[in-house]
A protein has these predicted regions:
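Extended alpha-helical targeting/anchoring segments
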Residues: 4-336
């Protein structure tokens, strides 16, 4: 086990110190050995070889717009303040190799090159491979310090410097996006308040701006001090699933999502991360994530619906969020 700059070997008490030291030496040697990067299979210019994949949503554009209108009706009735609605972009791999397409790792390298993010993840689960380019931290625990960084508010990057600056400024000044962000900040303050010391929950950053290859995001930071009798699992139980990808209030928002979305989300909007023996934890929100399974792959995209949401704008925002992944694939998007 490697923790920051330390290497620890564990074993049964009956084991000897000599055996433990031998394991440490073996692991240290492996860590110091240069690793050759995986070679990209021939013919992998596109996923599965051949023509670029063509993605198509699991719902018609008009049906998604209607779902947004239904969500707004629930908001107007006072059921919720915000609902995060999504749809799934799906494509077929023309010539899949063994193990979910066989080209997942080169694709992940390409995805990271096109869209560098702080919380990427590659999970080969055998029948399913998950390639995540998430920009969003869900929960981090270091000692007693807890941090969550919800993203709410998105604009596409501009094609020129002037257009890009206009997008950036427009997001920063958008009352709608700031209201969306603030709702989720309040929700997460409440979630952290269940497990943190009284009076320790703070918002050191409100409405910060982060730029990525294809989008601008409005990001806030909420922190707290975990109560000493609690641990990482207690923190996860109090906060999962993330408020930024469900809505507010969380449980009613999830009930509406269950009604309006035709498919279960799977790994999308869950969390990927690690928990260490020291109690440290870091997790991401599973967004901007491609899932490969057999001869199929899919990318789920969504956005927050509030009282003054425009259905057309909400739909366009979902596509902007998926653009980095689609660009990495050289993919085409077929709307219907």
């Amino acid at each position: 086990m490697c923790i920051r700059d330390r290497l620890i070997a564990t074993g049964l008490p009956a084991g000897t110190e000599t055996a433990a030291r031998a394991r440490l030496a073996e692991i240290e040697a492996r860590l110091e050995t240069p690793v050759e990067p995986p070679k990209e299979p021939e013919g992998s210019e596109e996923v599965g070889g051949g023509s670029p994949p063509r993605f198509r949503s699991n719902v018609r554009r008009g049906d998604y717009l209607e779902a947004v209108r239904h969500a707004k009706e629930y908001i107007a009735a006072g059921d919720v303040y915000q609902v995060n609605l999504s749809h799934r972009l799906e494509a077929k791999v023309e010539h899949p190799s063994d193990g979910c397409g066989g080209r997942a790792w080169p694709l992940y390298e390409r995805l990271r090159a096109v869209s560098p993010v702080p919380h990427g993840a590659y999970l080969d689960l055998g029948d399913v491979v998950v390639l995540s380019a998430s920009p969003e931290r869900f929960l981090r625990l270091d000692g007693e310090r807890v941090e969550t960084r919800p993203i709410k508010g998105t604009r596409p990057r501009g094609k020129t410097p002037d257009e890009d600056e206009a997008m950036r400024t427009g997001l920063l000044c958008s009352e709608k996006d700031r209201a969306e962000n603030l709702m989720i900040v309040d929700l997460l303050r409440n979630d952290l308040g269940k497990v943190c010391r009284v009076g320790s929950v703070r918002v050191p950053e409100l409405f910060g701006l982060e730029g990525y290859s294809s989008v601008w995001h409005l990001v806030s930071t909420v922190t707290g001090e975990l109560r000493p009798e609690l641990g990482a699992v207690d923190l996860l139980k109090a906060c999962f699933p993330g408020g930024s990808v469900t809505g507010c209030p969380k449980i009613r928002a999830m009930e509406i999502i269950e009604e309006l979305e035709p498919l279960r989300r799977g790994v999308y909007c869950g969390a990927i991360g690690y928990l260490s023996f020291t109690g440290t934890m870091d997790t991401s929100i599973v967004i901007r994530t491609l899932v490969l399974s057999g001869d199929r792959m899919h990318l789920q995209v969504g956005g927050a619906v509030v009282a003054d949401s425009d259905p057309e704008s909400e739909y366009a925002e979902t596509l902007a969020k998926g653009r980095a992944v689609l660009n990495a694939l050289g993919a085409e998007l077929e709307e219907w």
